[in-house]
């Protein structure tokens, strides 16, 4: 079983086969998911202090914040972008 590694910005990499969803952080339900993950200790902030542009939800219930656009993460997951 090969692991598909995806660059989510600033040298941070996630296992693509563990990603369930890549969403925008603006909606109230996503903000609630982020807050609940923070309270459970399951939030990973990979923004390096920059604005959160994508929220990545994994099958292990981890929530990862990224400073790159959801569309960019999606392209990298689908293999259309060589920036892995």
UniProtKB/Swiss-Prot annotation:
Pfam families with a match to the protein in the record: RemA-like
Organism: Halothermothrix orenii (strain H 168 / OCM 544 / DSM 9562)
The family this protein is said to belong to: Belongs to the RemA family.
Domain of life: Bacteria
Protein name (Swiss-Prot/TrEMBL): Putative regulatory protein Hore_09800
Matches recorded under InterPro entries: RemA-like (IPR007169)
């Amino acid at each position: 079983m090969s692991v598909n590694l995806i660059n989510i910005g600033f040298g941070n990499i996630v296992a693509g086969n563990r990603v369930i969803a890549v969403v925008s952080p603006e909606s109230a339900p996503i903000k609630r998911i982020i807050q609940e993950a923070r309270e459970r200790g399951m939030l990973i902030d990979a923004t390096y202090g920059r604005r959160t542009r994508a929220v990545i939800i994994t099958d292990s219930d981890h929530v990862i914040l990224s400073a790159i656009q959801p569309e960019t993460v999606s392209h990298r997951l689908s293999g259309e972008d060589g920036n892995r």
